[in-house]
Amino acid sequence: MSSFNELEKLLGYSFKNKELLIEALSHPSLRQHHEYKDNKDYERLEFLGDAVLNLVITKILFSNFASYNEGNLAKIRSYLVCKETICMVGAKLALKDYIIMTYGEEVAGGRDNPNNIENATEALIAAIYLDSNIETTHNIIGQLWAEFIKVQNLTDYDPKTALQEWAQASDHHLPIYCLIKREGAAHSSTFTVLVKVKDYEQIGIGYSIKEAEKNAARSLLHRLKND
């Protein structure tokens, strides 16, 4: 399993049961091949990892943001467990290089598919949890998500709501979002969205329309703050 050594170094964790690590990185496309049909893929681990990630992030926020109410904590958690953030964590670990998939999935762009990266990241969290304990998993998630948790400005967590509130407070019409471009394959598209409030315009790019809208709103808020 030497090919996973670098990944384990980035995680700061060495698996006792390497089969769990392999399962966490096995794409469902493998079941299409007879030689792999009895092998496990990451779908069940992804299900567990999603729950573990939500629990750990909730605990971290509850401990670190004592002055925030339930609504603000929910906004921050939503940002920390969204596809965009999970994919950024997966990118830090270079997970796309470790996912085990069929040749067909790979040539179709599977290594750059945000869904695959998100699913493998969540499955990896579950594998760590099953291989160790909740305390170890908590520490690893805390390290991997540290740069995102440090963001203190609620505007960065929920920029669309913040932009809407700014528009209402300034007696402007509500923000208008328009999809202006979609690029890439169907399963790995990037979207470009334009947001407009009065005479202000800004674009945002993301792996989904929702993500692109949030990025556009965040960029416009930063621009308004600096004007």
From Swiss-Prot:
Residues 4-133 form the RNase III domain. Residues 158-226 form the DRBM domain. It is found in: Cytoplasm. Mg(2+) binds at E46, N119, E122. It comes from the Bacteria. SMART domains: DSRM, RIBOc. One of its GO terms (molecular function) is ribonuclease III activity. Digests double-stranded RNA. Involved in the processing of primary rRNA transcript to yield the immediate precursors to the large and small rRNAs (23S and 16S). Processes some mRNAs, and tRNAs when they are encoded in the rRNA operon. Processes pre-crRNA and tracrRNA of type II CRISPR loci if present in the organism. The active site is at D50, E122. HAMAP family: RNase_III (MF_00104). Keywords: Cytoplasm, Endonuclease, Hydrolase, Magnesium, Metal-binding, mRNA processing, Nuclease, RNA-binding, rRNA processing, rRNA-binding, tRNA processing. Disulfide bonds: none annotated. Its cofactor is Mg(2+). Homodimer. One of its GO terms (cellular component) is cytoplasm. The gene is rnc. PANTHER family: RIBONUCLEASE 3, RIBONUCLEASE III. This is Ribonuclease 3. GO terms for biological process: mRNA processing; regulation of gene expression; rRNA processing; tRNA processing. Belongs to the ribonuclease III family. It catalyses: Endonucleolytic cleavage to 5'-phosphomonoester.
